[in-house]
A protein has these predicted regions:
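Primarily recognizes the serine-hydrolase "nucleophile elbow" in alpha/beta-hydrolase
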Residues: 1-43
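Short beta-strand/loop motif that positions the catalytic acidic residue
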Residues: 48-50
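Secondary-structure boundary/capping motif
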Residues: 34, 57-58
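C-terminal catalytic histidine-bearing segment of alpha/beta-hydrolase fold enzymes
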Residues: 70-117
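Short alpha-helix in the alpha/beta-hydrolase fold that links the catalytic acid
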Residues: 58-68
């Protein structure tokens, strides 16, 4: 499952809910979760592609995510894209970053090649 923005949040929530998918990709999605939810097992591969200048992903959100991924024994990775804002992959956005968008897509294809083999 691949999702951008709100869809990226949905992709991560799919992993959190342990739906039977081989892997999820969250591209500039929301990474936080309600603090009342406990961390549980994560049974799918997870790729998170995050713009470095996304104000919605604070250091605390990232710290909580790392803790959640590790406690859930997930096969996970986060790639952070320099000089990129929230909509860095959208060619119609003033924040579009062509170089980083191409890298994100390359990383997505590499991940899918591993997950779907």
């Amino acid at each position: 499952m691949i999702g951008y923005c709100f869809g990226g949040t949905g992709a991560l929530e799919t992993a959190r809910a342990n739906f039977p998918v081989k892997g999820v990709v969250s591209i500039h999605g929301g990474l936080g979760k309600d603090s009342t939810r406990t961390n549980g097992a994560l049974n799918t591969k997870i790729l998170i592609e995050n713009p470095a200048e996304d104000g919605g992903v604070t250091p605390q959100v990232m710290s909580n995510l790392v803790k959640e991924m590790n406690e859930g024994k997930a096969d996970w990775q986060v790639i952070t894209y320099a000089y990129s804002k929230h909509t860095f992959t959208d060619p119609k956005s003033p924040d579009y970053n062509e170089v980083m968008a191409k890298r994100a897509w390359s990383h997505t294809l590499l991940f899918l090649g591993e997950v779907l083999k």
